[in-house]
UniProtKB/Swiss-Prot annotation:
Species whose genome carries this gene: Chlorobaculum tepidum (strain ATCC 49652 / DSM 12025 / NBRC 103806 / TLS)
Keywords: Ribonucleoprotein, Ribosomal protein, RNA-binding, rRNA-binding
Organism lineage string: Bacteria, Pseudomonadati, Chlorobiota, Chlorobiia, Chlorobiales
Keyword Membrane: no
Assembly and binders: Part of the 30S ribosomal subunit. Contacts proteins S5 and S12.
Family indicated by similarity: Belongs to the universal ribosomal protein uS8 family.
A GO molecular-function descriptor: rRNA binding
Entry keyword Magnesium: no
Pfam families documented for this protein: Ribosomal_S8
NCBIfam families named in the record: PRK00136.1
GO biological process terms held by the UniProt record: translation
Protein name per its UniProtKB record: Small ribosomal subunit protein uS8
Recorded GO CC terms: ribonucleoprotein complex; ribosome
Domain of life (superkingdom): Bacteria
Length: 131
């Protein structure tokens, strides 16, 4: 069955794997998903990711990160802009949870966090929020 919202699928797979305490999860490959994985790795929400090209289809293996007490590093992750209701933010992007969490945006300069978008003075589509 085809996926209509690949970013929501990406978020759901990570959230479900974290809830099940899985060490890794496999996500079908797209460039956007690879860029999101790279951003989550840079911000410390996942341990690592690897792009695996198999005979059938390429996928991304994401290694999840857990705290010392066994809690998932991602407390909350949810989609903001959806296919039926797009959400855009101008240059004056507000902080999520006073700067504790992040908004992830798709901008003309690529996929950026809210802080990076403010520094580069660009706005864009708010893909999801993470804490």
């Amino acid at each position: 069955m085809p996926v209509t919202d690949s970013i929501a699928d990406f978020i759901t797979r990570i959230r479900n794997a974290g809830s099940a305490k899985n060490k890794t999860t496999d996500i079908p490959y797209t460039r956007v998903r690879e860029n999101l994985s790279k951003l989550l790795l840079e911000k410390g929400y996942i341990k690592n990711y690897t792009v695996i090209t198999s005979e059938q289809f390429p996928f991304i293996r994401v290694e999840l990160k857990y705290m010392q007490d066994g809690q998932h590093a991602i407390k909350e992750i949810s989609r903001v802009s959806k296919p039926g209701r797009r959400v855009y933010q101008g240059k004056d992007i507000k902080r999520y949870l006073g700067g504790l969490g992040l908004f992830i945006l798709s901008t003309s300069k690529g996929i950026l966090t809210d802080k990076e978008a403010r520094e580069q003075n660009v706005g864009g589509e708010v893909l999801f929020r993470i804490y």
